């Protein structure tokens, strides 16, 4: 489990123009909330944020928030808001945690291997890229390995088949499919008998018309 110390500052600015100025100065507005504390408006330097997100755990990294007033809180990223087009950070939500209490987190799946069913002409279909588990904050895994190399044609691997880290419990329904290998769709061949019957009917009608015209 990766753990990072993060320096943050309490902020008093709340108006849009002031918050926008923060971002111009490479500071990201944030908020900290959780059990038994009053929510705190914060700001964090962009480089500090990028450093915290640079570990293998990504946004599942365990944080030690260090406020400029000397206070310290264990926390996690609750929400990271980014501009959908330009990708810059808009706002960060931090949530304080108790290191002795379990919490529910989404953990990415690391898909490994080439399904044997693909070699046999199948098509792989991936339904899930992450699952939700419950564990202690200090036991949050960076990811969960999923070996799909033994999945054959018309077979699948479900959430309940995955190896969970010690001390964690599954939150996602075990019956949910992670990936499967399906047979390719085949095009239906036209009904040749009906086509032949149709051609015969046309020929008969043509012959009748010729006979009538001769009369």
UniProtKB/Swiss-Prot annotation:
GO terms for biological process: translation. GO terms for molecular function: 5S rRNA binding; structural constituent of ribosome. Keywords: Ribonucleoprotein, Ribosomal protein, RNA-binding, rRNA-binding. Residues 160-215 are annotated as: Disordered. Residues 185-215 have a biased composition (Acidic residues). Disulfide bonds: none annotated. One of its GO terms (cellular component) is cytosolic large ribosomal subunit. InterPro entries: Rbsml_bL25/Gln-tRNA_synth_N, Ribosomal_bL25/Gln-tRNA_synth, Ribosomal_bL25_b-dom, Ribosomal_bL25_C, Ribosomal_bL25_long, Ribosomal_L25_dom, Ribosomal_uL5_bac-type. Gene3D superfamilies: Ribosomal protein L25, beta domain (2.170.120.20), Ribosomal Protein L25, Chain P (2.40.240.10). Pfam families: Ribosomal_L25p, Ribosomal_TL5_C. Belongs to the bacterial ribosomal protein bL25 family. CTC subfamily. Part of the 50S ribosomal subunit; part of the 5S rRNA/L5/L18/L25 subcomplex. Contacts the 5S rRNA. Binds to the 5S rRNA independently of L5 and L18. This is one of the proteins that binds to the 5S RNA in the ribosome where it forms part of the central protuberance. NCBIfam families: bL25_bact_ctc, PRK05618.2-4. This is Large ribosomal subunit protein bL25. It comes from Natranaerobius thermophilus (strain ATCC BAA-1301 / DSM 18059 / JW/NM-WN-LF).
């Amino acid at each position: 489990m990766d753990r990072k110390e993060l320096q943050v500052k309490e902020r008093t600015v709340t108006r849009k123009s002031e918050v926008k100025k923060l971002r111009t100065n490479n500071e990201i507005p944030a908020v900290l909330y959780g059990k038994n504390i009053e929510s705190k408006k914060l700001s964090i330097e962009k480089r500090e944020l990028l450093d915290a997100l640079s570990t293998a755990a990504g946004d599942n990294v365990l944080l030690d928030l260090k406020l400029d007033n000397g206070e310290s809180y264990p926390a996690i990223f609750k929400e990271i808001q980014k501009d959908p087009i330009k990708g810059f950070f808009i706002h960060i939500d931090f949530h304080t945690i108790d290191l002795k209490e379990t919490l529910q987190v989404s953990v990415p799946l690391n898909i490994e291997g080439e399904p044997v069913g693909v070699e046999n002409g199948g098509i792989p279909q991936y339904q899930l890229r992450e699952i939700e588990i419950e564990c202690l904050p200090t036991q949050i895994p960076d990811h969960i390995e999923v070996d799909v190399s033994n999945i054959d044609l018309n077979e699948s691997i479900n959430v309940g088949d995955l190896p969970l880290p010690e001390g964690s419990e599954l939150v996602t329904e075990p019956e949910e499919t992670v990936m499967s290998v399906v047979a390719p769709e085949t095009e239906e061949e036209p009904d040749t008998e009906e086509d032949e019957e149709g051609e015969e009917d046309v020929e008969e009608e043509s012959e009748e018309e010729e006979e009538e015209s001769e009369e």
